[in-house]
Amino acid sequence: MRKFQIFSKSSIAIIIVFLAACHAPVEWTNYGGNKANNHYSSLVQIDTNNVASLKKAWEYHTGDADEKTQIQVNPLIIDGVLYAVSPKLKLFALDAGSGKEIWVFNPAEPNSVSAKGNGYFSMNVCRGVSFYKNGKNDQRLFYSASGSLYCVNAVTGKPITSFGTDGKIDLHQDLGVDASNLYVASTTPGMIYKDLIIVGTRVAEEAAAAPGHIRAYDVHTGKMRWIFHTIPQPGEAGYESWDNKEAVSYTHLTLPTIYSV
């Protein structure tokens, strides 16, 4: 089965369609399908000869859509479980075969805005989640909602409190400037590499904007391990190419936005 996406401001359902007879299951473990991130499925059961005969297997309603929300998520399917995010950024797990709800994680930020006092909720979509596994007993999901990166137990749906502060990281922090009142998000899932989750940064495209740096966090502790500055800092490669050396110190310089890595 190939990936699917729903692009509707008022979508309240996710619909999965299966062929009646499928062979051995093929998982969709990354936002891009696999570690190569090539958005490709090797499944061949569905083609132009039988696509017209497909029937809906089940339907799931998230129950939280309104005229201001949208859903752009590309779900993961791992070990028979589907993981996705609702219009109001609730993370949920379903039995991929039946559509039965297993658990729902609510980040507890109703009508959340990434920048305090600014109506950016309409921009706060979440396009998917990242999955990390270290043995049978350590399975983690990472996803962003309202300017925070959350770490959730993939089996129980509970936040892993040893990660960051009570299971989340404030993405407004560790940018080198005070971005507490600026729009900061990470709408595309981070990339898992060994014990790191590497996330891009989405910022406002206006004068008052936070830096759009790329950051890597320890998947266990939430500690930032490194940062790539989209405008080179003194001593970094490429800094010498900037004619205006004071550019890096501008508080509200609109830096490149990195949606994904």
Model-based region annotation:
Residues A115-G117, F121-F131, A145-L149, A154-M191, ...:
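Asp-box/WD-like beta-propeller blade repeats and closely related beta-sheet repeat scaffolds
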Residues R2-I12:
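Bacterial N-terminal signal peptides that target proteins for export
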Residues P25-D66, K100-N118, K158-A179, K223-T230, ...:
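Aromatic (tryptophan-biased) beta-strands that constitute blades/sheets of beta-rich domains
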Residues G212-K223:
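Beta-propeller blade signature
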Residues V44-D47, V51-Y132, Y143, L149-A154, ...:
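N-terminal cofactor/phosphate-binding cores enriched in small/glycine residues
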